[in-house]
Amino acid sequence: MNKDNHHIKVSLTNNPYEIVIGKNSLESIGDELFNIGFREGLKVLVVSNKEVSDHYGDCIIKSLIKSKFKPKLLIIKAGEDQKNQSSIDLIHNAAYEARLERGSLMIALGGGVIGDMTGFAAATWLRGVNVVQIPTTLLAMVDASIGGKTGINHSKGKNLIGAFHQPRLVLIDPKTLISLPSREFKAGMAEIIKYGVISDLELFDLLERQENIADLSNIKEKLLLEIIKRSAKSKAEIVIKDEKESGVRAFLNYGHTFGHVIENLCGYGKWLHGEAVAMGMVAVGQLAVQRGLWNEDNAKRQKRLIEKAGLPSNWPKLDIESVLSSLQGDKKVKNGKVSFVMPLKIGDVKLFNNISNKEIRECLQKIS
């Protein structure tokens, strides 16, 4: 175990685990698995996509073999349009071929899509096998890999099919961001800004003080580690309080309700998830201004930081009635009313369940 790695405990009652963050931590995956109780002869299915596997697949496999585990590597296509039952069938077929047992392990090596699909495949194979998340995108590092949400999309909406299935370990190696396309890095910054708005004013202020947060090459290693650690810790603290999203975990949906509509109506792939969330945060910021929940200055601060990160901030051209219809398909609708997480100030949000179509229509007309 690398003594330089940073450990964050996700202290759940039934399924506690750690988030391990550190440079070159990929090389110690075998040791990390041994440290949490896995032993010689363990059957492991590593699921990745070609781009990520070309960079890091060999490193993972060598570490697993060194620890006397029995790994198999499955390469599948990533991308939001691949997050479907057909991809799950591919993973399940590979699990069958690898003779995975209930004590076996799946490892998700990739971004949020790979993590979501592998997690869901693990949750549903043999009614649940172990899963480890090794996120290689910024968005997955600070959000998707932590908390046990897994799932796939349905033709009617994003993530409508899924399960809660906590990982045994989340291993984050910031060096994997070097191979990340610039647009993907910026998309991850949207989730980091989200944490600043919902719970961490100091993080928001830290990001505001930087000259450039849109380009990885301009962010010092120490700062990058600090941003990742603060964001992962924010996510972990919320998950510990509310594992199954019955209370404060809903705060993590800030910007996502509108964001999912953008992804759904524009077609998956048109906008990256983080880009859609960024536009969603600006939209719900305007909704909060309308309600008098926070002031125009805070809304402008949020929008400026989103733009500073190189993210889109203007609402796309969408038919308002189509937006209202799409919102009704959201998982968080209760009694026909759409729920929105809205900011009270930077660092504090609240869930509102009584948002009318009239308010939403007025908001969209204002920002369109």
Swiss-Prot record:
KW Transit peptide (keyword) present: no
Subcellular location: Cytoplasm
Pathway field: Metabolic intermediate biosynthesis; chorismate biosynthesis; chorismate from D-erythrose 4-phosphate and phosphoenolpyruvate: step 2/7
Keyword presence, NAD: yes
Keywords for this protein: Amino-acid biosynthesis, Aromatic amino acid biosynthesis, Cobalt, Cytoplasm, Lyase, Metal-binding, NAD, Nucleotide-binding, Zinc
Cofactors demanded by this protein: Co(2+); Zn(2+); NAD(+)
GO biological process entries: amino acid biosynthetic process; aromatic amino acid family biosynthetic process; chorismate biosynthetic process
PANTHER family the UniProt entry points to: 3-DEHYDROQUINATE SYNTHASE (PTHR43622), 3-DEHYDROQUINATE SYNTHASE, CHLOROPLASTIC (PTHR43622:SF7)
EC number(s) stated in the UniProt entry for this protein: 4.2.3.4
Cofactor details (free text): Binds 1 divalent metal cation per subunit. Can use either Co(2+) or Zn(2+).
A GO molecular function held by the record: metal ion binding
Any one of the GO CC terms: cytoplasm
HAMAP family: DHQ_synthase
Main location: cytoplasm
Class of the enzyme per the UniProt entry, highest EC level: lyase
Binding positions for NAD(+) per the UniProt entry: G112, V113, I114, G115, D116, T136, T137, K149, K158
Reactions accelerated catalytically: 7-phospho-2-dehydro-3-deoxy-D-arabino-heptonate = 3-dehydroquinate + phosphate
Residues that bind Zn(2+): E191, H256, H273
The protein's name: 3-dehydroquinate synthase
InterPro entries on file: Dehydroquinate_synthase, DHQ_synth_AroB, DHQ_synth_fam, DHQS/DOIS_N, DHQS_C
Role description: Catalyzes the conversion of 3-deoxy-D-arabino-heptulosonate 7-phosphate (DAHP) to dehydroquinate (DHQ).
